[in-house]
Amino acid sequence: MLKSMRTSIITIGIIIMILNLFGCSERTKQNNNKPSIQTPLTEQIIDTTSDDMLLEVVYDNLFRKLSPAYDKEYEIVLSWNKSRQAIYMISRLEAEVNNGGYNQFYFNSSGQFAAALPEALKLVGATKFADLTERANSTFEKEKSKITEAQDGTVEGFSKSYENNPLNKFDEEFYKLNDVENLQKIQVDYIRKNKKEFTD
């Protein structure tokens, strides 16, 4: 009885080790598909990174350049070439609008790039997104006091600022436009055609 129990435990242990080995192996393979953000970005990395990972790799590389001095984000980003500026700003816009709409974009530090974004979007070939963002910028400037009136620094105040917010219509338009003209694909195509602009 004791011998068969010991054999069962050993067998189970071996099975667990084999499963862990294969599980870890798969995780390692997945992580190897994405270059470390600690390495300089090279043409080879851009060429060998899949389309679904390229934007993240480039953004990570750009964000790493900010990390030590994030409080100077605006100045640092504007010191980059136009291509890097565009990808960084568009990624911020897309993340904010997809998470909480244009209202959240303007509320957070990403809003500091609002005026520069239409040109950045045009640069990468996203002209319809540029037009949409110009209209959202114009509405925000005209309706700023109404939009920000409830934003008192509390979660409740920010949540209340979505009620009857004139920016809400732009959120819906952004989502529908992105279904037709994928903004991430537009950026990936731009990066591939202009890869020297992104290498370190």
Please tell me what each predicted stretch does.
Residues 2, 105-106:
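A generic structural signal for short
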Residues 2-11:
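Bacterial N-terminal signal peptides that target proteins for export
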Residues 10-18:
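Hydrophobic helical h-region of N-terminal Sec-dependent signal peptides
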Residues 21-23:
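C-terminal motif of bacterial Sec signal peptides marking the signal peptidase cleavage site
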Residues 25-27:
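Bacterial signal peptide processing site
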Residues 32-88, 94-99, 106-113, 120-200:
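Extended, alpha-helix-rich binding/interface surfaces that flank or overlap catalytic cores
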